[in-house]
Amino acid sequence: MLQTLERTNIFDARVLTAAHADALRALAGPDGLPLLPCLHPALEEGQIDGDYAGQDELQAAAALLPLYAEDPLPTSLRAAGYGADGQGAVLTPPILREDYTQLRHFLRLALRWATERYASYHVWAVLPLDLEHPEACDDLCAQYLSAGLTLRGMRPMAGADQMLIFSAHGLVQWRDPLRRCHLADPALPRVLERGYAAADFGWGKNGLELVLRPV
């Protein structure tokens, strides 16, 4: 479940450049980063963040794409009404080595860089809903929420039949929870559409339980 122990306390995150192309390809494989058609332009623009975690090989990477870009992910996000003005950025799902345990730190840093880089609180992150691997999906969602992200939406988008949409802008007020939902709950997309969000969670006998509150 949610990783609470760090096997290494070395955190060596940086903005990747063209000089890191081979290291990035070694991590990502032939398919590259999820939801990013071309690596080279993103490297040239300084849009990919990575963490070596004190190792010789790259351990984690994700792209921060401006919402005004014409790539499939920003375009799909704008069409869904998230960041329709084109301001801000969206973080692609990260690629991680199997034993990488610092995802929360990596997400926090990437989101802080996005806020500074694009001077906007319209910073989003997405995660494909993978119900074929529920435990892994629960763990990733818990990591995102633990990093300070808020689950705001769930809908079909480029790259996934259902995409979890997180905002780096937290809830202004904490109100009594409406209900608890699992990621596989068919009511979850409708509840989120009605103006509820999940910024915290618990664990039950069936896995991750999102705590939904009105925004």
Regions found by a protein language model. Name each.
Residues M1-L43, G50, D176-H182:
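Short amphipathic alpha-helix that is part of the acyltransferase structural core
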Residues M157-R180, G207-V215:
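C-terminal "cap" of GNAT-fold acetyltransferases
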Residues R25-L58, A63, L67-A69, A187-E193, ...:
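Active-site rim helix/loop that mediates acceptor-substrate recognition in acyltransferases
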Residues L129-M154:
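Conserved active-site alpha-helix within GNAT-family acetyltransferase domains
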Residues G88-A89, T115-P134:
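Conserved GNAT acetyl-CoA-binding A-motif
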Residues R175-V191, Y196:
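Charged/polar low-complexity intrinsically disordered segments, enriched in acidic residues
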Residues P37-P41, E45, G50, E57-E98, ...:
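Conserved acyl-donor/pantetheine-binding loop and adjacent beta-alpha core of acyl/acetyltransferases
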Residues P93-E116, D139:
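Conserved acetyl-CoA-binding loop-helix of GNAT-fold acetyltransferases
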